[in-house]
Swiss-Prot record:
Function: Catalyzes the reversible adenylation of nicotinate mononucleotide (NaMN) to nicotinic acid adenine dinucleotide (NaAD).
GO biological-process terms attached to the record: NAD biosynthetic process
Transmembrane segments: none
An MF annotation (GO) of this entry: nicotinate-nucleotide adenylyltransferase activity
Class of this enzyme: transferase
One Pfam family linked to the record: CTP_transf_like
Protein name: Probable nicotinate-nucleotide adenylyltransferase
Gene source species: Chlorobium phaeobacteroides (strain DSM 266 / SMG 266 / 2430)
Keyword Membrane carried by entry: no
Annotated EC: 2.7.7.18
Catalytic reaction list: nicotinate beta-D-ribonucleotide + ATP + H(+) = deamido-NAD(+) + diphosphate
Source taxon at top rank: Bacteria
Cystine pairings recorded for this chain: none
Keywords: ATP-binding, NAD, Nucleotide-binding, Nucleotidyltransferase, Pyridine nucleotide biosynthesis, Transferase
Higher taxonomy: Bacteria, Pseudomonadati, Chlorobiota, Chlorobiia, Chlorobiales
Length: 197
């Protein structure tokens, strides 16, 4: 079994997150995705907004299940009372899933800072890493292969201009975001009046 681990703040989850998971299934033959809601390592107090993030990630998992990709939400990092780091999450998941292939999904920006991550050398022993690198769509269309492998790291060409930061700004400014987030998450944001200020 091949399990992808996709961590993030998911504030909010959006169509880019959905597309990354589906592309990972297509190119890496993923059987299941674990969506781990990350804490800011410098913010130790939980807030009501963490519950909203967890609920929205649950809706993202439901969207993935509609495509027949099993998805599970992990709140392990949110429950910790100490700063959480990716290597700790992977150690935990390795005990939960001792006999599966784990692949960590990361964006290109995060991967550039990889040598600064806590115990980054151990990470490549605990899992494979799939890096979604930004490539303009016209370049993707002319490449024979969207997947490149170097050692334990897979580089996947990916073009998605959507970001949680711009979605929050759009909502605060009253601009529509229906093309950027799944409809169930959009409804949740409206119902709970999130990102209004």
């Amino acid at each position: 079994m091949h399990v992808a681990v996709f961590g993030g703040t998911f504030d909010p989850p959006h169509n880019g997150h959905l597309a990354m998971c589906l592309l990972a299934r297509e190119l890496l033959h993923i059987d299941k995705v674990i969506l781990s809601i990350s804490n800011n390592p410098f913010k130790l107090l939980r807030s009501d907004h963490d519950d909203h993030r967890k609920n929205m990630v649950g809706l993202l998992a439901s969207e993935l299940k509609k495509t027949e990709l099993p998805a599970e939400v992990s709140g392990w990092e949110l429950q910790k009372k100490t700063p959480s780091y990716t290597v700790e999450l992977l150690r935990f998941l390795r005990t939960e899933y001792p006999d599966v292939q784990l692949t960590l999904l990361v964006g290109e920006d995060s991967y550039r800072e990889f040598p600064l991550w806590k115990s980054y050398e151990e990470l490549v022993l605990l899992c494979r890493i799939a890096v979604f690198r930004r490539v303009p769509p016209e370049q993707i269309a002319h490449r024979e292969q969207r997947l490149e492998m170097i050692g334990n790291v897979r580089f996947i060409d990916f073009d998605c201009p959507i970001s949680s930061t711009t979605i929050r700004a759009d909502i605060a400014s009253g601009r529509p975001v229906t093309a950027k987030i799944p409809s169930a998450i959009n409804r949740y944001i409206i119902d709970h009046r999130l990102y209004r200020d």
